[in-house]
Amino acid sequence: MSEKTNDEKLLYCSFCGKSQREVRKLIAGPSVFICDECIDLCNDIIREEIQVDETAKLAKTSLPTPHEIRETLDQYVIGQESAKKILSVAVYNHYKRLKNLSKVNNGDDVELSKSNILLIGPTGSGKTLLAQTLARLLDVPFVIADATTLTEAGYVGEDVENIIQKLLQKCNHDVEKAQRGIVYIDEIDKISRKSDNPSITRDVSGEGVQQALLKLIEGTTALVPPQGGRKHPNQEFIQIDTTNILFICGGAFDGIDKIIRGRSEKSGIGFGADVINQNDRKELNKILKDIEPEDLIKYGLIPEFVGRLPVVATLSELNEAALIQILVEPKNALIKQYNKLFSMEGGVELEFREQALVAIARKALSRKTGARGLRSILEETLLDIMYDLPSIENVSKVVIESGSNHDELQPIVIYAEKPKLARSSK
């Protein structure tokens, strides 16, 4: 770099022609000089070209069709056919809209708005797994947030903008990637307000959180601290536009069937109390499919929040047969995972008898944990054998079968035959 002194010859930028006195810095190369202003201009041009390249790359990337999305979901999620179809179409339309965003912004008068998704279903029915599988298929950053830990900004608890901070961390602070990610907010039903009427007192973990999430979901510029942590007045922030982030909210909404039934009886749709058996899962699933926005509002979600979740998919409670399928059929089924784990122990084979699978499914049903509870039941069942196996030699197979009362599960260890020694000829 040349110094600004009176003793030396005056130097000029080779690009803009300004003298060293007119700029802050002048950097020298072999018979050439460039000023700080031209460097800034070059950096701006490069940044713009990189953004154009990223947009073009996204446009060229083949977006899986709804059929292809559904096929991938089928590999990991058992049942829930209606929910998978709804999700496949909604996610396809969302990312198709993002791919054609530049066309929309170039003079087209039709603006496509975002359709966020609400998943309603009992614990362990596959809500989180569906969202995770979609993010993995589309290769976009994905983060899960628990609505019960969120509070309004300024109160003790987790700020809603922390969700975007986690999303940014997932993609190594790549802002462009984060702005096309997926956010799954679980337990959304737990932030419903306690009554139909707006409360006079401040509800910082219920309606207040809905109001805060509303801005995030409909599209705002979130200010995220670059290194995480709490915000400070004098620090710089990374700006994240949430307009194109897909938000998927999930919740069990326990008791909403009574609200739907009450509305249906008034309107004469035919869900009479005499006809419905409370314990009949099929009837309950049928009722949930008739959910309307007014039912969600009566449950405790504010109308504006319901309006920002136009795509609603209901998931059925899993029955015994579905839980057995979940154990053995998906691409990463739990039984396949434990088989692989046992095979690492000197090639030991793990086998579950049919009655053992039935017993595991029934345990999960009795605990009301759905598919989520299957792993803990398997861990309990296999704990002793996994503890002893590394210390036992010559094991070829472990068989899990049900006990005499069909609820107990017991492992049977099968040893390999020792090879017979050949007789030496005299």
Swiss-Prot record:
Domain ClpX-type ZB: 1-54
Short name of any one Pfam family annotated for the protein: ClpB_D2-small
List of residues binding Zn(2+): 13, 16, 35, 38
Residues binding ATP, per UniProt: 122-129
Keyword line: ATP-binding, Chaperone, Metal-binding, Nucleotide-binding, Zinc
SMART domains cross-referenced by the UniProt entry: AAA, ClpB_D2-small, zf-C4_ClpX
Organism superkingdom: Bacteria
GO CC annotation terms, alphabetical: HslUV protease complex
GO MF annotation: an example: ATP binding
CDD domains per UniProt: RecA-like_ClpX (cd19497)
Presence of the UniProt keyword ATP-binding in the record: yes
BP GO terms, sorted: cell division; proteolysis involved in protein catabolic process
Assembly with partners or alone: Component of the ClpX-ClpP complex. Forms a hexameric ring that, in the presence of ATP, binds to fourteen ClpP subunits assembled into a disk-like structure with a central cavity, resembling the structure of eukaryotic proteasomes.
Record HAMAP family: ClpX (MF_00175)
Similarity remark: Belongs to the ClpX chaperone family.
Biological role: ATP-dependent specificity component of the Clp protease. It directs the protease to specific substrates. Can perform chaperone functions in the absence of ClpP.
Protein's name according to its UniProt entry: ATP-dependent Clp protease ATP-binding subunit ClpX
Organism: Nitrosomonas europaea (strain ATCC 19718 / CIP 103999 / KCTC 2705 / NBRC 14298)
Gene that this polypeptide is encoded by: clpX
